[in-house]
Design a protein with these regions (language model features):
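N-terminal membrane-targeting hydrophobic helices
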Residues: 1-146
């Protein structure tokens, strides 16, 4: 599994490349990079939620990689950006687009590091076959160290 810092910095790095070479600095302010970095970590909100539920119920609960790591949530956030775009609210459209990008980047990193098996929740389709096995095992600690 990729570490939290990899999710945050990786999302910021990828979004900054897009900012410089695709969209332009004037159309992509820096605060969006911060939002994208936070969104790159957002799918892991299931860790503290699981800890809280475990504390309240007195049992061990672990639902990491289930609903928060779904492409469906990222697609819903992307759709919210499209709706805001057509309502001529460009500021919020960009924010939703960047959150969706950070969410997709998180799922991509988790696929590369082979940390879970389903990213098409609520469908019960095992998606481990889509993720590269060799990269996940061989380069895992090296990429986190960089």
């Amino acid at each position: 599994m990729a570490l939290a810092v990899t999710h945050v910095l990786g999302a910021i790095f990828i979004l900054d490349i897009l900012r410089h070479y695709v969209f332009g600095k004037d159309k992509f302010p820096r605060y969006l990079l911060v939002i994208g970095g936070i969104a790159g970590l957002a799918p892991d909100i299931d860790f503290p939620l699981g800890w809280f539920i475990s504390f309240v119920q007195g049992t061990s609960v672990n639902f990491h990689g289930e609903f928060t790591h779904s492409v469906l949530i990222a697609a819903i956030i992307l759709f919210m950006g499209v709706v805001r775009h057509y309502q001529d609210d460009d500021k919020w459209a960009k924010i939703f687009y960047v959150i969706a990008a950070g969410w997709f980047i998180h799922i991509g990193f988790d696929c590369l590091f082979n940390s879970y098996e389903t990213f098409l929740w609520p469908l019960e389709i095992q998606t481990k076959a889509f993720c590269p096995q060799k990269l996940a095992g061989f380069y895992r600690s090296g990429i986190d160290a960089i």
